[in-house]
Amino acid sequence: MEQEIETESTSTALSQDQVLQAALKLFSQKGYFNTSLTDIKDAVGLKTTSGVYQFFKTKQAIAQTLRENILDSLSISIDDVRRRNRKASEQLREIVDLLFKLTDDAPEIVQFLLFIKTDDFLPEATPLLDTPAFNKIRRIIQNGIKEGEIRAIDPLMAYCYFFGIINQTLALVLQGALAKSADSYQSQAWLTAWGCIAKK
């Protein structure tokens, strides 16, 4: 009897993560509104949707947890990047490396984070640019301007120029319009994006 209880609690701990992983994949492939709890249940291999309700009351709660988890992980990664590198150019280069690596290794994460309009189904969520992770990126740009590494322009415009190129490249890779892996375009995208904001 004790062994049965242990097995059930172990599978419960795994199941919440499995629900999140399945939902992430489905949201990224089909979109939030085209994904039902039944789709998530089927992807996880549960018999009924009550297995999903055991962890999350709504599909919106799943999406919110996913977004928070992804943004928390990104924020921690950015902290690591900032500790390892002093210059804004080095920090931005490592963030670009991370985004391109994620696009190749975990495309669902990049799709969900950058290209799915989460404000359509999470209206109360903090706007992406106001989250801790993206505030840190904006601070990197501000510091780069202050240190004279980045042109003296509005920091938000510098963000737009730089990440407009990076994000559009990633979007085209995810859509299949750019046929090779993201890694194949990383160097060229970096040089172009950095060239837009670097102080000459």
Where are these regions (language model features)?
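A short, glycine- and basic residue-enriched loop/turn
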Residues: 16, 59-60, 110
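Amphipathic alpha-helical packing segments from all-alpha helical-bundle domains
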Residues: 72-75, 79, 122-147, 156-160, ...
